[in-house]
Amino acid sequence: MRTMKLAPSVFGAGIGNLSKQLKILEENNVELLHVDVMDGHFVEKMAFGPDHIKMLKELTTIPLDVHLMIEKPERKLDTIIDAGADIITIHQESTTRLYSCIEKIKSHGVKAGVVLSPATNEDTLKYVLDKIDMILLMTINPGEAGPGFHEELLTKIKNVRELIGDRDIDLEVDGGIDNTNIAKCKEAGVNVFVSGGYVFKGDIAEKIKTLREALK
């Protein structure tokens, strides 16, 4: 049975209390910390970068799950790797060099994954399935935040889980994940759950507990 993993998104955290919030996440044994890197081109927003990843690496022992929402990620991979990313996921739509990007990431001992936006066909994964460690499925459009989980994408999640088969690949979902839909995602085949606003608004420890209860 696949291990269920929570990956709170630091994009939803309050920067002023970040150290305290990270400590609460550590105390509640979250498995990953999701970090969105945005360049203002692939998506309209800008958020985080190598310096922020390096800072987070110094502040927490939680492995960093870095989601690159940037154009031509091959130009930034060296700095992202050097900053301390433990997992790097890149959008299939963001580069014409997907295969070489994956190989470069893995050559540095970092786990590599592919991200699919809601409208991207999952068939593109077939060519890299034997090279990757993670698939991230967006259930909202990249760069958006807040509620908006699109339940019709559960079928796509099931299809991707079937493509994975018995390969050792984590299936991650990001976009509007909370206690009302996390179990449906698990049932569809997800084992890594990104949640930002839901986790960080209110009692963080209680929110983590609620998500874990919903996964039972």
Pin down the residues of each PLM region:
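Catalytic cores of alpha/beta
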Residues: 74-82, 120-131, 177-192
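Glycine-rich beta-to-alpha transition loops that act as phosphate-gripper elements at the mouths
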Residues: 9-14, 66-74, 94, 115-123, ...
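Glycine-rich phosphate-binding active-site loops on the catalytic face of alpha/beta enzymes
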Residues: 88-97, 136-146, 188-208
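Conserved, mostly hydrophobic/aromatic
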Residues: 18, 25, 36, 80, ...
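N-terminal active-site wall of soluble small-molecule enzyme domains
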Residues: 39-104
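Glycine/Thr-rich beta-alpha phosphate-binding loop at enzyme active sites
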Residues: 39-47, 51, 118, 126-158, ...
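Alpha-helix-loop-beta-strand connector modules within alpha/beta enzyme cores
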Residues: 46-66, 104-113, 153-171, 211-216
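Hydrophobic faces of well-ordered beta-strands that scaffold small-molecule active sites
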Residues: 5-9, 33-35, 64-68, 88-90, ...
